[in-house]
Amino acid sequence: MKITQVTEVDITFDNGNRIYFDHDQDCCEHNYADFKQIDDLAWEWDFDENLKFESCPHSGFRFGNEGRMVFVPCYSSQNGYYSTWIDIYYAPCWCGVLLDGGHVLGFNAKMDEYE
């Protein structure tokens, strides 16, 4: 499967499968996966549907297959008081229907403090 679309909230593959993030916002923090920062080479790769996921605590996560892993940086923009936790999901598409995403990772994102 190949990447067909990258937005601020997800990565979509040509078979309809998606990778996306979630964070239960408390108040004044913004935790997110910066999907738009993936390497341009990732658009050319043909991934197996059985993706592997690895967290890189305080920096982001990697996904892909043996020998072809793509890094996605993750950030938490806040004042340092709130959680930096972010969850990553992988949702398969079956017969054109996007199924509920399976939770694949949970970790602390890189804090980008503001005053």
Segments from the language model and where they lie:
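Surface-exposed, interaction-prone regions used to assemble/regulate multi-protein complexes
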Residues: 1-115
